[in-house]
């Protein structure tokens, strides 16, 4: 417990908020009579309640400090009084170390929306990209299809598609590059697309807008034809099958629509 005191003190000094996992076994470890005492000892922001707590205990604790519930196991109708009387109620999805055990999108969305409709903030996990946690080292995402993609891409999908309230990195390591991209979006609201262009280099570092009438299968750039010079010719080049994620520009065969991206 001495190491925990040192670690938590340092984290608080650095401006972090600490969410501590606690169970009834934690009382024995710290030799205290309530988990609220643990929260005071370590100066944590919120407690994530594991197994062993009855509803009355959760309600009493929720009135004193933020608590985090397991999003996968709680029933909304059972925690209405916690939301009504508690200081702050959050629900955290699990992360899944083993491949093929992460949540599917439909189930995740159903749970997330029902919790948010009840006034509960939802937290989910993305994998790291530098240091993966053992013993399996396959990432710690909430959603299975995030397991082998970049933390930035996983963060953007959780934020923009699923509208989760907070995103945590499950693994111990995430690169400075990925942190910078995530922070940039949080600061500016602009989505960064890392790409190497063989042509149309004038698009580098340009901020463009997605057309609001883009269909679900493509994203059209609003300013694309405005960026094309009047006398510019776009010859056919690399006219292969367009894979998911491909960025293409219409060539001269599209006549006055040439240049659309």
What are these regions (language model features)?
Residues 1-84, 88:
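Active-site beta->alpha loop and helix N-cap motifs at the rims of alpha/beta catalytic domains
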Residues 196-261:
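C-terminal functional modules
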Residues 70-199:
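Catalytic alpha/beta core domains of metabolic enzymes, predominantly
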Residues 2, 17, 25, 40, ...:
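Context-gated lysine
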Residues 18-37, 44-59, 106-110, 160-169, ...:
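Electropositive, surface-exposed helix/loop patches at the edges of structured domains
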